[in-house]
């Protein structure tokens, strides 16, 4: 089987390589402005808003004409809208984190271990774990210790029962051996 690798040409060179009279069609250039795929992976996207694109982007270009690039004013407006959206998003993030901090400071520390269904747990977020990692470790240690104690008691009971059975069989075997060896002879102090 043959395997081949191909490289795509960058879009900026296509305009220079293809003349308007060329039989090949020109590839669409990407829209100017912010690209949605270039956000940092840990950042949450700002809330979606309905925006109307600029008038130059709404009208399709006739088939034979070149596509116009946005004017510096349109680029400035796009950047300004994106910056305002980013500021609102950051403001919401700060307000939410402050309200969470205030809520957790006003609650008593004893309610941190309440069950999720109890009335004292209404302030907890859904994503917040009920127990910390240390508390889970302590709970697991206690459960393992209790289970180990239970198994140990059960083992001791079974072992003592088996030992008692073995002792009884030993006594019976010894009694049978003595009776078989000496049979009907009377026992004496000197044997």
UniProtKB/Swiss-Prot annotation:
Q: Where expressed (tissues)?
A: Expressed in macrophages and satellite cells.
Task: Tell me, in one coarse class, where this protein mainly resides.
Answer: nucleus
Q: Where is the composition biased (Polar residues)?
A: 49-59
For the modification Phosphothreonine, which residues carry it? 71
- Keyword NAD appears in the UniProt entry: no
Q: Which UniProt keywords apply?
A: Nucleus, Phosphoprotein
Q: What induces it?
A: Up-regulated in activated satellite cells and in the regenerating muscle. Down-regulated by MSTN in skeletal muscle. Down-regulated by dexamethasone by a MSTN.
GO BP term (any one): positive regulation of macrophage chemotaxis
Q: Where is this motif: Nuclear localization signal?
A: 23-28
Q: Do you know which InterPro entries this protein is assigned to?
A: Akirin
Its subcellular locations are:
Nucleus
Motif SYVS motif: residue span? 188-191
Q: Does the keyword Nucleus apply?
A: yes
Q: Which residues carry this modification: Phosphoserine?
A: 22
What does the UniProt entry report for the null mutant? Mice grow normally and do not display gross developmental abnormalities. Embryonic fibroblasts obtained from null mutant mice do not express Akirin1.
One GO CC term, this protein? nuclear membrane
User: Further notes on this entry?
Assistant: 'Akiraka ni suru' means 'making things clear' in Japanese. The name is given based on the presence of the clear nuclear localization signal.
Entry's family note: Belongs to the akirin family.
Q: What does this protein do?
A: Molecular adapter that acts as a bridge between proteins, and which is involved skeletal muscle development. Functions as a signal transducer for MSTN during skeletal muscle regeneration and myogenesis. May regulate chemotaxis of both macrophages and myoblasts by reorganising actin cytoskeleton, leading to more efficient lamellipodia formation via a PI3 kinase dependent pathway. In contrast to AKIRIN2, not involved in nuclear import of proteasomes.
Provide the protein name: Akirin-1
Please tell me the species this chain comes from.
Mus musculus
